[in-house]
Amino acid sequence: MVWFQCDDCGENLKKPRLPRHMSMCTATKFSCIDCGNMFGQVSVHYHNQCITEAEKYGPMVRSNGESSKQKHDFDINAELFNSQWFCSLCNATMTCEQDYFAHVYGKKHQEKANEVADMDYSKQQSEHPAVDKNNLTQQPDLDIYVGLSNDYPWFCSLCDINATSEQTLLAHANGKKHRVKVERFDAEQQKRQSTQHSTVDKKDYSKQQIEVDINVGLSNCYPWFCSLCNVKATCQQNLLSHANGRKHRENVELFDATQQQQLEKTTVDKKDTTVNASDGNSEQKKVDLLVSSGVANGYSQAHKKRKLETCDETWKREVVQAEEAKGGGEQKSESKKAKKQDKEKKRKKDKKQTKSDSDFEHDKEDIKQLLVAYSKEELVNLIYKTAEKGSRLISAILESADRDIAQRNIFVRGFGWDTTQENLKTAFESYGEIEECSVVMDKDTGRGKGYGFVMFKTRKGAREALKRPEKRMYNRIVVCNLASEKPGKAGKEQDMAEPVNIDLTKMANQSEAVLPGIELGRGHVLEKMHHQQQQTMDMFGQNMPFYGYSHQFPGFDPMYGALSGNQMLAGLPNYGMFGSGMMTNQGSMLPPPNHLGMAGQYFGDGEQAWHQR
């Protein structure tokens, strides 16, 4: 079988594998491993001369010395004769091909072949002298993997080639074409790096030479403009881009140059003035010398006098300028001090005037007489108009309002009988600091009556609590009002009713117990009639709510309890203990809505219903 090597990827191939390899690789030439001849894609199929040698020896060494599969440091076929099975190194003959190859790959033959290779290497070194490694310019190793993909799909971006597997891609990377392109790529990169370094060095050198403040003449806020170039911009970014331009930089350089020249001139002038002021006598001597030289040269005396006068005048002017320059700073400081003193004097005068005005005060009795003539509404309007924020009048009004307990004390009603002072305090602490908190208790039962008082430390807390008078407290609706405020007169008139003559004889058909006529005031029941009334009310399944807890029998209807608490039959009077108003409807079977609602709401606890009306 003939063996070929691909010129592009360097892979060793048998003849039947050539068509498949051609479809995968872009190689156009193949070399025979035995004879070393080059063939194209078509002529390869007609090469059949090396069939016997390839079948005998397998893939042999190419003419340029590269092996196909294994690369040995020495030639194991050294000193072998192909005609006979004989080894000249070991001086041994073999009878067949198998013995021949077994001897060639043996240890003894390999050791002798290594010795021969070492001898040849020493001869080459003796013929060619050693070269210093330091003088050599070592070429950098090429990175063959440049342009190769790490994952599927396998391709080479440098050569623009696709591969079916990773092995074929690596074989392509070892080929000549890929190596040439990698060398070109490395050379281009080195050129780019060198040019970049040169440009960076030039830029740094230019920056070191000239350091210009680009922000000179730029506005810090809207409107955006450049005073040096007399240019306007729509935004800050456009202004900064203008500052980086060439024209603006040139104008900034000119501005800096003019400033430096002015500074140099001022320094030179100062030096000249100091020298002229200190060395005035020397200048006079120079003038005398000039005059004598002029006389020697034949100038007229009048001309000489003019020169002397001009020199004296200039010298005097320079001396005066130097003195003014020295004393200018002192004069400015003195003028500032004088201005400050004048301002202080004016302030003192104003204070004296205000003191004199304050000394003139009216008598308090006169003010009282004036205020008596005003009504309450007029006084309120006058104070409201004259008072201003931060004034003493407002502060005095607020302090007096905070001291007044009536402005800070709140009356709370509607909570349960089991509420304590701690519960009430925690419910109202969110509005402000509390000074006192009390719950009104019943002396007989020792339970709360359902109302209490909360006193805040400041008026602000009370105001915040009264913004919403109705609040939810422990699943109950609580009503808040100022303690000084009382219910309206209409309610009082209804509450202050005359005693009612209660007669329960009409209920004899329903109960055997008969109550004698007794006059009862509002909210009072005689202890003697407690047992008799309880017997009459037990038939309806409910005790009187005033006496505390009630008992319900199975199948009880709350409507009957509501009727028993107010009026059961036509003509019966109202007891006046379950509501604030009196009943006048003698012919109706149902009580008014307010009494019906109270009885139905507090059916389980009559005493609590009494306090929650």
UniProtKB/Swiss-Prot annotation:
<feature type="zinc finger region" description="Matrin-type 3">
    <location>
        <begin position="224"/>
        <end position="254"/>
    </location>
</feature>
<dbReference type="InterPro" id="IPR035979">
    <property type="entry name" value="RBD_domain_sf"/>
</dbReference>
<dbReference type="InterPro" id="IPR003604">
    <property type="entry name" value="Matrin/U1-like-C_Znf_C2H2"/>
</dbReference>
<keyword id="KW-0694">RNA-binding</keyword>
<feature type="binding site">
    <location>
        <position position="32"/>
    </location>
    <ligand>
        <name>Zn(2+) 2</name>
    </ligand>
</feature>
<protein>
    <recommendedName>
        <fullName>UBP1-associated proteins 1C</fullName>
    </recommendedName>
</protein>
<dbReference type="GO" id="GO:0003677">
    <property type="term" value="F:DNA binding"/>
</dbReference>
<dbReference type="Pfam" id="PF12874">
    <property type="entry name" value="zf-met"/>
</dbReference>
<feature type="zinc finger region" description="Matrin-type 2">
    <location>
        <begin position="154"/>
        <end position="184"/>
    </location>
</feature>
<keyword id="KW-0479">Metal-binding</keyword>
<dbReference type="GO" id="GO:0008270">
    <property type="term" value="F:zinc ion binding"/>
</dbReference>
<keyword id="KW-0677">Repeat</keyword>
<feature type="binding site">
    <location>
        <position position="50"/>
    </location>
    <ligand>
        <name>Zn(2+) 2</name>
    </ligand>
</feature>
<feature type="region of interest" description="Disordered">
    <location>
        <begin position="322"/>
        <end position="360"/>
    </location>
</feature>
<dbReference type="InterPro" id="IPR013087">
    <property type="entry name" value="Znf_C2H2_type"/>
</dbReference>
<feature type="binding site">
    <location>
        <position position="47"/>
    </location>
    <ligand>
        <name>Zn(2+) 2</name>
    </ligand>
</feature>
<dbReference type="InterPro" id="IPR012677">
    <property type="entry name" value="Nucleotide-bd_a/b_plait_sf"/>
</dbReference>
<dbReference type="GO" id="GO:0005634">
    <property type="term" value="C:nucleus"/>
</dbReference>
<dbReference type="InterPro" id="IPR036236">
    <property type="entry name" value="Znf_C2H2_sf"/>
</dbReference>
<feature type="compositionally biased region" description="Basic and acidic residues">
    <location>
        <begin position="322"/>
        <end position="344"/>
    </location>
</feature>
<feature type="binding site">
    <location>
        <position position="35"/>
    </location>
    <ligand>
        <name>Zn(2+) 2</name>
    </ligand>
</feature>
<keyword id="KW-0539">Nucleus</keyword>
<feature type="binding site">
    <location>
        <position position="25"/>
    </location>
    <ligand>
        <name>Zn(2+) 1</name>
    </ligand>
</feature>
<comment type="function">
    <text>May regulate the turnover of mRNAs in the nucleus.</text>
</comment>
<keyword id="KW-0863">Zinc-finger</keyword>
<feature type="zinc finger region" description="Matrin-type 1">
    <location>
        <begin position="85"/>
        <end position="115"/>
    </location>
</feature>
<dbReference type="Pfam" id="PF08790">
    <property type="entry name" value="zf-LYAR"/>
</dbReference>
<dbReference type="InterPro" id="IPR014898">
    <property type="entry name" value="Znf_C2H2_LYAR"/>
</dbReference>
<dbReference type="InterPro" id="IPR000504">
    <property type="entry name" value="RRM_dom"/>
</dbReference>
<keyword id="KW-0862">Zinc</keyword>
<feature type="zinc finger region" description="C2HC LYAR-type 1">
    <location>
        <begin position="1"/>
        <end position="26"/>
    </location>
</feature>
<dbReference type="GO" id="GO:0003723">
    <property type="term" value="F:RNA binding"/>
</dbReference>
<feature type="binding site">
    <location>
        <position position="21"/>
    </location>
    <ligand>
        <name>Zn(2+) 1</name>
    </ligand>
</feature>
<feature type="domain" description="RRM">
    <location>
        <begin position="408"/>
        <end position="485"/>
    </location>
</feature>
<feature type="binding site">
    <location>
        <position position="6"/>
    </location>
    <ligand>
        <name>Zn(2+) 1</name>
    </ligand>
</feature>
<feature type="zinc finger region" description="C2HC LYAR-type 2">
    <location>
        <begin position="27"/>
        <end position="51"/>
    </location>
</feature>
<feature type="binding site">
    <location>
        <position position="9"/>
    </location>
    <ligand>
        <name>Zn(2+) 1</name>
    </ligand>
</feature>
<dbReference type="InterPro" id="IPR039999">
    <property type="entry name" value="LYAR"/>
</dbReference>
<dbReference type="Pfam" id="PF00076">
    <property type="entry name" value="RRM_1"/>
</dbReference>
